[in-house]
């Protein structure tokens, strides 16, 4: 069966400007959250990625009028109907689990297929389930393919998350906005995307305090009205381009960026020796090799993002000594290691840590096992001698808007082919 691949002839310097898209991890929660509104919602600054299109079509399955036009989405929930969503759309996208919290909040009932997304090892939704049960939902998990959630009424509760989880924090917020009384989420995730979703819900009339801290309080309200809302810039897309620019950038200017959101990466790149200029809403990066070796450990926000662990790895082949990368969030997130070895990289991983030594990369045929592994392989392809062919590019398109066109505009020798 024919499939699209991305090809890169490495060694070309990057120069120019890139506009960073809206945050994927905000958009995939805010789009389901629109179904909580009574009336019309307008979202601006959406990333133009396949995950957004999938979620919009899930809204349409609930008889919601949804018009997606580039970065803008208009939603009208006037004719909304509760319908089961156990279908292949849900399986293709992990963030479809936000439909659970939103539908539970709106209808007190939902039937939904089990979510999919990137295969990153264990990513259970047990904390989501724990939160829904605390709010009064009964959950039927007897089916292998779908889950049924029903609540006679939703009541505020004190919920302590056993592990910090962005998904669970947001999903419980969605379910709790209409619950009677006050809900408290302790050990809540502090990520900018959590704050963004809370700000969106508040723009519709929700009563939420403490988003961005470890304790979030939600006082249930009867009704949420429509609103207009602009999504924050994508810190992971920004970080991925920062890594590509540090690898091959003569001078790359990134616009629509919140420097505070990428602080952990910026500090690590400066440790490496990258030349970085930071302004209000833009960052300028110039390559400055050879780089110093560094150690990286992923942590929850504001620590180093697990989503940037893979994109930064190719830079560590350009250093003077060995570097160590440890992923404490998803210890199984090292499927890119084998692909980099195919390119001649001196890299090994074991039990959540990769050891990376200076290496010369050569073009090869490689497979993107997940979204951020795809960004890693693109960066590796930009550095490598010869042509790199990346298969399984659907993962890359799930999270990066027009990445091939952006890199081409910066001067990369990159193109797509059908094979």
Swiss-Prot record:
EC number: 2.5.1.7
GO biological process, one term: cell division
Residues spanning the signal sequence: none
Catalysis: reaction(s): phosphoenolpyruvate + UDP-N-acetyl-alpha-D-glucosamine = UDP-N-acetyl-3-O-(1-carboxyvinyl)-alpha-D-glucosamine + phosphate
Pathway of action: Cell wall biogenesis; peptidoglycan biosynthesis
Record bears the keyword Cell division: yes
Family statement: Belongs to the EPSP synthase family. MurA subfamily.
Residues that hold UDP-N-acetyl-alpha-D-glucosamine according to the record: 94, 123-127, 307, 329
InterPro entries: Enolpyruvate_Tfrase_dom, Enolpyruvate_Tfrase_sf, MurA_subfamily, RNA3'P_cycl/enolpyr_Trfase_a/b, UDP_GlcNAc_COvinyl_MurA
Entry protein name: UDP-N-acetylglucosamine 1-carboxyvinyltransferase 2
Annotated residues for binding of phosphoenolpyruvate: 24-25
Keyword Cytoplasm annotated: yes
Catalytic machinery residues: 118
Superkingdom as given in the UniProt entry: Bacteria
Its biological purpose: Cell wall formation. Adds enolpyruvyl to UDP-N-acetylglucosamine.
EC supergroup of this enzyme: transferase
GO molecular function annotation: UDP-N-acetylglucosamine 1-carboxyvinyltransferase activity
Main location: cytoplasm
Pfam name, any one: EPSP_synthase
PTM sites of type 2-(S-cysteinyl)pyruvic acid O-phosphothioketal: 118
Cellular location(s): Cytoplasm
Key words, A-Z: Cell cycle, Cell division, Cell shape, Cell wall biogenesis/degradation, Cytoplasm, Peptidoglycan synthesis, Pyruvate, Transferase
Organism taxonomic ancestry: Bacteria, Bacillati, Bacillota, Bacilli, Bacillales
Cellular compartments per GO CC: cytoplasm
């Amino acid at each position: 069966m024919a499939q699209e691949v991305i090809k890169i002839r490495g060694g070309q310097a990057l120069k120019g400007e890139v506009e960073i898209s809206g945050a994927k991890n905000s958009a995939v929660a805010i789009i389901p959250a629109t179904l909580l509104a009574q009336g019309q919602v307008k979202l601006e600054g959406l990333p133009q990625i396949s995950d957004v299109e999938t979620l919009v079509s899930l809204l349409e399955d609930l008889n919601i009028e949804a018009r997606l036009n580039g970065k803008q989405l208009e939603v009208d929930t006037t004719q909304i109907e509760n319908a089961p969503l156990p279908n292949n759309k849900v399986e293709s996208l992990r963030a479809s689990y936000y439909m659970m919290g939103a539908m539970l909040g709106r209808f007190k009932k939902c039937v939904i297929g089990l979510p999919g997304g990137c295969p990153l090892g264990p990513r259970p939704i047990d904390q989501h389930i724990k939160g829904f049960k605390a709010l009064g939902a009964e959950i039927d998990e007897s089916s292998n393919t779908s889950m049924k959630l029903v609540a006679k009424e939703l009541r505020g509760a004190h919920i302590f998350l056993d592990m910090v989880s962005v998904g669970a924090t947001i999903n419980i917020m969605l379910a709790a906005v209409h619950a009677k009384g006050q809900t408290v989420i302790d050990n809540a995730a502090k990520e900018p995307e959590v704050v963004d979703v809370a700000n969106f819900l508040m723009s519709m009339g929700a009563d939420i305090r403490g988003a961005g801290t470890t304790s979030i309080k939600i006082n249930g309200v009867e009704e949420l009205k429509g609103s207009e809302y602009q999504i924050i810039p994508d810190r992971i897309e920004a970080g991925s381009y920062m890594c590509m620019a540090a690898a091959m950038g003569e001078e790359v200017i990134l616009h629509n960026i919140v420097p505070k959101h990428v602080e952990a990466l910026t500090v690590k790149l400066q440790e490496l020796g990258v030349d970085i200029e930071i302004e209000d809403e833009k960052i300028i990066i110039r390559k400055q090799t050879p780089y110093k070796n560094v150690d990286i450990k992923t942590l929850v926000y504001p620590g180093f993002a697990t989503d940037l662990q893979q994109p930064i790895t190719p830079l560590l082949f350009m250093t003077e000594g060995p570097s160590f990368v440890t992923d404490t969030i998803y210890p199984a997130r090292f499927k890119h290691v084998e692909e980099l070895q195919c390119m001649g990289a001196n890299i090994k991983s074991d039990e959540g840590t990769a050891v990376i030594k200076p290496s010369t990369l050569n073009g090869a045929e490689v497979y993107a096992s997940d979204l951020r592994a795809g960004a890693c392989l693109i960066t590796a392809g930009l550095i490598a001698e010869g042509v790199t062919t990346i298969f399984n590019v659907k993962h890359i398109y799930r999270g990066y808007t027009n990445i091939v066109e952006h890199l081409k505009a910066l001067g990369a020798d990159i193109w797509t082919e059908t094979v």
